[in-house]
Amino acid sequence: VRIECNTIYDNIGKLKSGKHAFLPVSGVILDNVEVELSGGESAFDVIKKACEENVCTDNCKYCKANGVQIEYTYTPAFNNYYIEGIHQIYDKDCGTQSGWMYSVNGNFPDEGSSSYTVSSGDVIVFSFTCNMGEDIGNYY
């Protein structure tokens, strides 16, 4: 599992006040962390577990106590969890088209992360986009 927000550095002028403290120097919050699967987990389950069990690459004081912060809400209409923020970086924090997206093995699934069942060996990346995914390689 990898969590990255390096696109923010290309759009730093749009970043909301007070959010600079949560940006890792490298732009990477978690770097290729392995998560043990028992079978049937979703991409959401994996990211949640990775955040609970690890600290960020900067080993910041915010993560030392409880792991990497992650906030999400359940959306009944889509029967899915929506990731609002990771490491205190939330959707719309870097412009109106910013937020979190995920890819599995380099592809962006057409379904929410809690609907996508992962397999052992999958490479899961949660990336912060500042431009509806175009800046991270997701072109509709």
What kind of region is each of these model predictions?
Residues 1-140:
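Ubiquitin-like/PB1-type beta-grasp interaction modules and other compact soluble beta-rich domains
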